[in-house]
Amino acid sequence: MDGEEDSEWMMMDVGGKGGKGGGGGGAADRKKRFSEEQIKSLESMFATQTKLEPRQKLQLARELGLQPRQVAIWFQNKRARWKSKQLEREYSALRDDYDALLCSYESLKKEKLALIKQLEKLAEMLQEPRGKYGDNAGDDARSGGVAGMKKEEFVGAGGAATLYSSAEGGGTTTTTTAKLMPHFGSDDVDAGLFLRPSSQHHPPPPHAGAGFTSSEPAADHQSFNFHSSWPSSTEQTCSSTPWWEFESE
């Protein structure tokens, strides 16, 4: 294709400079297109060397049957066309790179906007719990502290376990469990409620002068026995004589 284009626009003057009135030939005689063989030889030489020295031009012109001036003009025009095509190729490559960069820029711009929106949503989510639950946090802490002070167990100065209970009306009562229930163990005291008698502690033996009189029936005395292991009436005395007779004496 390049050879055909070159043959169309490269028409060299093969005749000499004649006078105005000289009838050597017309314009068609003075101009001649390059043949295909000449164009191929010139292009092969141009592929190896874009600019020829005067000696190389003369030798190539002799081989092709052309004038050195024709060879020089052909190489000059060919270099101009070659540079123009090279610039077009470079421009096309740069244009493609620019389009790719522009597309990448637009994609990154959209991604940036999406990330900004996502960041704003996360910031709103972080601020929402503070405004919604921040005021109630203090109330929960205060109510928890009051509930914790409802019922607490302390140890008195004398070593006896005491139960401290705070009433809602503001009054406080402190009672010593050892004074109230001497027959119950410490494991039976659960939040101020005495549910069952202790199986590990037995009541002390009756003191002299503090027993029941003989006028009281025995059935009434036996009704105060709390434990099944409480000794019977026969086991409380060393003989068969009831123990209240000794006390009455």
From Swiss-Prot:
GO terms for molecular function: DNA-binding transcription factor activity, RNA polymerase II-specific; sequence-specific DNA binding. CDD domains: homeodomain (cd00086). The keyword Ribonucleoprotein does not apply. InterPro entries: HD (IPR001356), HDZip_class_I_plant (IPR045224), Homeobox_CS (IPR017970), Homeodomain-like_sf (IPR009057), HTH_motif (IPR000047), Leu_zip_homeo (IPR003106). Keywords: DNA-binding, Homeobox, Nucleus, Transcription, Transcription regulation. Residues 27-86 bind DNA. Residues 85-129 are annotated as: Leucine-zipper. Residues 212-242 have a biased composition (Polar residues). GO terms for biological process: positive regulation of DNA-templated transcription. Pfam families: HALZ, Homeodomain. Residues 1-32, 194-249 are annotated as: Disordered. Probable transcription factor that binds to the DNA sequence 5'-CAAT[AT]ATTG-3'. Belongs to the HD-ZIP homeobox family. Class I subfamily. This is Homeobox-leucine zipper protein HOX6. It comes from Oryza sativa subsp. japonica (Rice). The gene is HOX6.
